[in-house]
Amino acid sequence: MVEWTDSERAIINSIFSNLDYEEIGRKSLCRCLIVYPWTQRYFGGFGNLYNAETILCNPLIAAHGTKILHGLDRALKNMDDIKNTYAELSLLHSDKLHVDPDNFRLLADCLTGVIAAKMVPAFTVDTQVGWQKFRSFVVSALGREYH
């Protein structure tokens, strides 16, 4: 079980309350696919991912980025039990999709950069500390079935 301070809970809720899920989700997934091109192998059914421009303009990638970000709502609503909240999703990614669990961290890194850029100057050190704790528990929960 994760222990959260009132301040950490407030920080995470504040971040999510101000997110444009479509914009942040799209930008984060696009950034991940462009910066870490080997992650594209999981998106073979999403059409042309030939270069950065085609990735940025791909509506399937945009929609999936939004879906991923909305998936974080589950962790937000279940902050005290993130591990069990994502147990089924972890199983799907490990057993059926065979996603390299390190890709969760790569996407989380990209999401952090996009959120920080959007929130400037509100993405303070304290905000980042709370966010890093949240995202680290999500990444760990998603990779749980790989252990």
Curated annotation (Swiss-Prot):
Q: Which residues cross the membrane?
A: none
One MF term in the entry's GO annotations? oxygen binding
What Gene Ontology terms describe where this protein resides (cellular component)?
blood microparticle; haptoglobin-hemoglobin complex; hemoglobin complex
Q: Which SUPFAM superfamilies match?
A: Globin-like (SSF46458)
| GO biological process assignments | hydrogen peroxide catabolic process
Domain Globin residues, every copy: 3-147
Which tissues is this chain's protein expressed in?
Red blood cells.
Top-rank taxon, per record? Eukaryota
Residues that bind heme b, according to the entry? 64, 93
Keywords (alphabetical) are: Heme, Iron, Metal-binding, Oxygen transport, Transport
Q: CDD domains given for it?
A: Hb-beta-like
Q: Respond yes or no to whether keyword RNA-binding is given for this record.
A: no
Checking Pfam families in the record gives: Globin
Q: Which residues form a coiled coil?
A: none
Q: How does it assemble?
A: Heterotetramer of two alpha chains and two beta chains.
Family under the similarity heading = Belongs to the globin family.
* Function comment: Involved in oxygen transport from gills to the various peripheral tissues.
Q: What is the protein's name according to its record? A: Hemoglobin subunit beta
In its UniProt entry, the species of origin is given as Gadus morhua
Gene name of the encoded protein: hbb
